[in-house]
Amino acid sequence: DTLTGSLGATSATYVTDTQYLQWGTVAAMLFGTHPGKSSMVTWMRDPGTQRLTGMDLHRQVTPGVTDEDTSINYDPAGNITQVKATLPGGQVDNQCFSYDHQQQLTESWTPNTATCDPGTRNQSALGGPAPYWTSWATNTIGKTTSRTDRTPTKASTTSYSYPGDGASSSRPHFVTGTNTTGDDPGTASYTADDAGNTTNRPAPGGGDQELVWDELNQLTEVTKSGGSVAKMVYDASGTRVLRQQGDTTTLYVAGNEIALNTTTSVVSANRYYGH
């Protein structure tokens, strides 16, 4: 099972070979045909549940070396509790996850060990290439009430505001505001239309953005201080066909993105394949 593409007079095979398990799930894929530069990704699954339990990446340019060895662990309810990636040289990116009785994520962190012991979870004991520790608090009906973000050197807590609960409440699960304390303090507010679409939100760099939606609840424009930040156009099926943002206009057609820089007249493109 291969995937081949062409551009002009040249063609290339992107997926050289695909191997499947007896259940029809993909077990391995071989990429590329250039001598000595192909790579293979292998996926491991639990035979009873078919849950993904691991992934290995091997490249021909590094024979005998596993470029990435990822393992995935679950709790009895099927929630992911650990994703551990071991990289060349022994560097480990270990992400751990804990859940409450409602099976909502409450803790996500990267310890400086290969295990996920909640008893050793500490801001000073974070590790990996991008160390972090995030905690979420929820109320009895499942709304997130606060989030605490930590790195080895910083910490901040964000609390969330909602409309009132009850049958007469409008959009009771829509976040209307946030208040952040700690190393990155700040406040933010949000509004929504009757369909629940966000109509106002904080803008990057300060100020607010207004979001405009059509009758099909598709985002058509983002504005700031009366000026357009981005515009989107859709076809009759609801698929986005055009996006204008800044000096770039992007056309989406037949699995391709064709972008024109209206200032420099430079055209770039991305092509996407399904396999």
Segments predicted by a language model, with ranges:
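Short, small/polar residue-rich loop motifs at catalytic or cofactor-binding pockets
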Residues: 12-14, 36-40, 66-68, 90-93, ...
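Short secondary-structure transition motifs
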Residues: 131-178, 206, 211-275
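Short glycine/acidic-enriched loop and turn motifs that connect beta-strands
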Residues: 34, 60, 87-90, 152-153
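Surface-exposed extracellular loop regions of Gram-negative outer-membrane beta-barrel proteins
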Residues: 1-3, 98-121, 191-233
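Beta-strand-dense domains in secreted/periplasmic systems and polymorphic toxin scaffolds
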Residues: 1-6, 26-29, 52-55, 80-83, ...
